[in-house]
């Protein structure tokens, strides 16, 4: 338990001023603009939007600047701002199959309808520091094909679906209510729609560790990356007073469909199963990790053995939110004076009782004293 502390307002005000000074850095260096962060630190912006549950690159960039680059603090800032926004309703389900693709790869099929598109990726870089970036050397323009149309391609799993080799998509019916982890507390067991929401806004590092654990034998499902795609998807909203869909714009998404082995059961034939990941922006690592953990959490419903951490809803879901985790861990910095004084009183009492017991155990009895005197007398003779 921590308690309120009186006083310290002047110190807190001074700390805020010092924080602003440290955030600005050397005044001789040009100030870092929100536009620069948005355009040149886009992957950090994407993570803040994803885990902050708010798609707004400018606000995410502002949060990163305000947090001095601490992404979890930036996520906290964005979520706090999100709570002040009015909610007009839900958008229509997005059709990621109509995504305007910037990157698309598959680890299961070499030749795909629509082809594989490497796009912007670190996958084949040599991981050597580029001194040219420090010197501000101009970057070559990417190769472009004049008049190149936007690329739209069908999903890879559609090919397996037509052959009945993969489980049917369990997309909820349009009239079935969907949970909302931002308004309703988690309950167990959680349905898959709730789990996917929690995973989508969960901490990337925690998901990465859980996904990695499944590859080291703790809930292994032998996954294949069926398809990873990144691109823009249109968002539609249907106002009640209009009765038809209105386009609101587009968002950049990364989608991962993982294909996993399944030996079958008494009610289901041997077939592939699905793991799914979908996140804001370009964030393949998180989308892959999300798909791995999604599939691991389905072990019980598929009749598989459970016991691994990644398969336990009550371990995964309550612990993957980095804002909650940060609040609980960092609250240890707050005053705990009363608790600690109580611990001190208890410890001193226990020490006093222990010392008394030790003195009693080591104090010689009357018989022992007589034996000692007799031994000394015999030694003197």
For each predicted feature, which ranges?
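Proteins with a high burden of low-complexity, intrinsically disordered sequence enriched in S/T/G/P/A and R
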Residues: 2, 6-9, 52-56, 70-78, ...
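Hydrophobic alpha-helical segments, chiefly the membrane-spanning helices
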Residues: 34-58, 63-89, 93
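Helix-turn-helix/homeodomain-like alpha-helical modules used for DNA recognition
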Residues: 87, 93-153
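Acidic, serine/proline-rich low-complexity intrinsically disordered regions
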Residues: 143-381
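A ubiquitous, low-specificity "background" feature that marks scattered single residues
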Residues: 76, 95, 106-109, 113, ...
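N-terminal, Lys/Arg-enriched amphipathic/low-complexity engagement segments
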Residues: 1-50, 99-119, 123
